Amino acid sequence: TEPTNVLDWYETNKAAFAPPVCNKLMHKRQLSIMFVGGPNTRTDFHLEAGAEFFWQIQGDMELPIVERGKRKLIKIREGEVFLLPPRLPHSPQRTEGSFGLVIERERAPDELDGLRWYTDFEKCDEVLWERYFYCSDLGRDLVPVVEAFKASDECTTMRPGPNGGRVTTPPLEQDMITMVPPPFSLQAWLEEHEDDLSQGHHLNLFP
């Protein structure tokens, strides 16, 4: 296939990035390659067994995560890349006019994703409600989970209830060990490694 100019592709598909959708899939086979725009704010945190790659092409975004059990705010600025390790709760927040690339790997048939709400979005120290589900299409498969949360007593009271808002034995264990490295400029990295790359050497963007 022919190479694709990302900015030209974005202009052609700009209507797909209007709210409430704000994203469009470019490729799906082994890897899901999607572009996500804004505005997009959410109160849930997503967990998955694989890593996620972010490249912020236009504008900035914020990515609250839960690292070692504590909330941490990752700011991914225009031109920066970031690799989110597996099994870390994360909640992408995108501003109007922003535009970025996200790459996820295809899920295994027996693999479940998680969607979680906390009693306090700013602290993330107590789980309010969560569900685990098979995810083959993020935009489609999240909808019934979000609707189930909105219909729950926990959503109304913002307090953990006796009706099983939290999964006692989750099929996906949260990573409580990994410390996340900060985002960095892709252009600066390319310039730093220009000599090696020009000689055809293969380098890992994330060692």
Q: Predicted regions: what is each one?
A:
Residues T1-V81, P89-P207:
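Jelly-roll (double-stranded beta-helix
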